[in-house]
Curated annotation (Swiss-Prot):
Protein name as catalogued: Omega-6 fatty acid desaturase, chloroplastic
GO cellular component: chloroplast membrane
Organism of origin: Glycine max
Family: Belongs to the fatty acid desaturase type 1 family.
Major subcellular site: plastid
């Protein structure tokens, strides 16, 4: 599921060449003239040169060469206007097809890939203490301050997810067994099965923004969007007020069905599922026994919903920009998908600390092996070497309003993504 940030066509597969039936006609056309039609779609037009006809012969006046004008997304002025309109600091310049991911990785300092056990366990300490503080705040807060306590606790427990996230990418410790244990324990309070998520998330990184293949993010298909009024309304409301909790649907859909995994993965998946169900079978009754149903809502459910707010919001912001290339596998470019197809966003400092810089997302997609505590140094290097290609933003109301009210619709017949407003 994806959304985009403009009211016009922002992604197109390539210049459309009008079919020419005869060779003598081909000489009368000059390619490279772009225009904007009444629907706001960019199209390539052809200027026909007139033939001067006499009774005896036909003289063809050949076209004068006209420089090809850049598509709007390649225009610095256009990208600057998009950034201003939709809350971005910068909309990245499209990356050339001949750039490889290795070209992007090579300039990164070697130290950003190094694992530091002290820093890794420091992040665990931050998450555990901030979560414990949140539970204490919930226990002591009067009813009118409970929302603030839930916001803090939900954000703190999101840090647990980021720790498990590093473990899954093998960037937490040099010991894989330690990573699997820590990752499983970090995911258990979220009732998120660690191994199923790891398998599916690895595929997301391997096939980022690849149509039909990416397990985390893709546009809505036009035929689905327009198929029936009922389904269209379901998509509209799903992409509207409930969008900040859509990760719950993703969690249910992708991580509990054994048929979605390879036979070699199933044993590890079963272990993770057993751990999650053990937490439900033991943890939930214990919470209810000590605090009652309202205590379960206060101490577990509300922070869990807060976590899913951040899970959904981070994912939406990371993968939404005015120019995100979605392509089929035969046209997909790894460097474009990871550098052009992801977004860096700055949040209030306390959120970045509790969530271990998960918002510094572009270097994480360039190489998932970079530990969370080295992402800022890696991003600084990317800014120095590839700065003009980066999508960057600061979290703001304009950005969130756009993400909540516009979705990206892919038209497979035209091989392009256009934008549909889903909410007023």
């Amino acid at each position: 599921m994806a959304c985009t940030l403009a009211d016009s066509l922002l992604l197109f597969k390539g210049s459309y060449q009008k079919p020419v039936l005869r060779r003598d006609i081909a000489a009368r056309y000059s390619p490279g003239i772009f225009s904007l039609n009444s629907n706001g779609l960019i199209q390539k037009r052809f200027r026909r040169q007139r033939n001067f006809v006499t009774r005896n012969k036909v003289t063809v006046i050949h076209a004068v060469a006209i420089p090809v004008q850049p598509a709007p997304v390649e225009s610095a002025e256009y990208r600057k206007q998009l950034a201003e309109d939709y809350g971005f600091r910068q909309v990245g310049e499209p990356l050339s097809d001949d750039v490889t991911l290795k070209d992007v990785i090579n300039p990164l300092p070697k130290e950003v890939f190094e694992i530091d056990d002290v820093k890794a366990w420091k992040s665990v300490l931050i998450s555990v203490t901030s979560y414990a503080l949140g539970l204490f705040m919930i226990s002591k807060a009067p009813w009118y301050l409970l929302p603030l306590a839930w916001v803090w606790t939900g954000t703190a427990i999101t840090g647990f997810f980021v720790i498990g996230h590093d473990c899954a990418h093998r960037s937490f410790s040099s010991n894989k067994l330690v990573e699997d244990i820590v990752g499983t324990l970090a995911f258990m309070p979220l009732i998120y099965p660690y191994e199923p998520w790891r398998f599916k998330h690895d595929r997301h990184h391997a096939k980022t923004n690849m149509l039909r293949e990416d397990t985390a993010w893709h546009p809505v298909w036009k035929d689905e969007f327009e198929s029936t009024p009922l389904l269209r309304k379901a998509i509209i409301y799903g992409y509207g007020p409930f969008r900040c909790w859509m990760s719950i649907a993703h969690w249910l859909m992708w991580h509990f069905d054994l048929k979605k995994f390879r036979p070699s993965e199933v044993p590890r998946v079963k272990i993770s599922l057993a751990c999650v169900f053990a937490f439900i079978a033991i943890g939930w009754p214990l919470i209810i026994y000590k605090t009652g149903i309202m205590g379960w809502i206060k101490f577990w459910l509300m922070p869990w919903l807060g976590y899913h707010f951040w899970m959904s919001t981070f994912t939406m912001v990371h993968h939404t920009a005015p120019y995100i290339p979605f392509k089929y596998s035969e046209e997909w470019n790894r460097a474009q998908a990871q550098l052009n197809g992801t977004v860096h966003c700055d949040y209030p400092k306390w959120i970045e600390i509790l969530c271990h810089d998960i918002n510094v997302h572009i270097p994480h997609h360039i190489s998932p092996r970079i530990p969370s505590y080295n992402l800022r140094a890696a991003h600084k290097s990317l800014q120095e070497n590839w700065g003009q290609y980066l999508n960057e933003a600061s979290w703001n109301w304009r950005l969130m309003k756009t993400i909540m009210t516009v979705c990206q619709v892919y038209d497979k017949e035209k091989s392009l993504c256009c934008l549909r407003r889903t909410c007023p």
